[in-house]
Amino acid sequence: PSHQFPTGVTMPAGRRAELLHWAARAPGRRYIIEDDYDSEFRFDTRPLPSLQGMAGADGPVVYLSTCSRSLAPGIRIAYMVLPRQLLGAWQAKYRLYSGTVGRFEQQTLARFITGGYFTRHLARERTAYKARRDALVAALRTSFAPEELTLRGYTPACTCWRS
């Protein structure tokens, strides 16, 4: 819901609430899978709350994200936040699954996050990506007539169409 690819459209708060209400009407039977892979890269506004954040720990949202966009493409660590009612079943089914990411990498990332380095890193990245995005937008605006170009979105390489 933070933005839809490739259009860059953001799901409005009212629609998010409607979606959560729809899932809540059938508890244990309807779940929303939220793949929030780069919501931390908003430049002009604060990040919007995730559906999982709006629903809470008992809500009907399975939240997925990754560190490959926010840190580096080579850091292939993703994570999932399950509703409490699904956690036991997941642990029972996958208790022997060791994952594909080594413990060293996981522990290094955990220390990076708990030490506050991840938050500082994101602030630097937002500044750098905003500057790059602004330079791209300026170059596009000088290269095309206003009626030929439509720009939308907040992502580092915003969506553009040429008429």
Protein language model annotation of sequence segments:
Residues 32-36, 65, 81, 153, ...:
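Short beta-strand segments
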Residues 51-56, 142:
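Short, conserved catalytic or adaptor-binding loops enriched in Gly and charged residues
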Residues 28-29, 114-117, 146:
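Inter-domain helical "communication" segments and dimerization helices
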Residues 1-4, 38-39, 68-70, 84-87, ...:
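Short, solvent-exposed loop/turn segments at secondary-structure junctions
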Residues 110, 130-137, 148-163:
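Conserved glycine-rich beta-strand-loop-beta hairpin in the small C-terminal domain of fold type I
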Residues 1-43:
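Active-site phosphate-binding strand-loop segment of PLP-dependent enzymes
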Residues 57-127:
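Conserved core segment of the aminotransferase class I/II
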Residues 30, 61, 148-149:
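Short, conserved active-site loop motifs that form the nucleotide-linked donor/cofactor pocket
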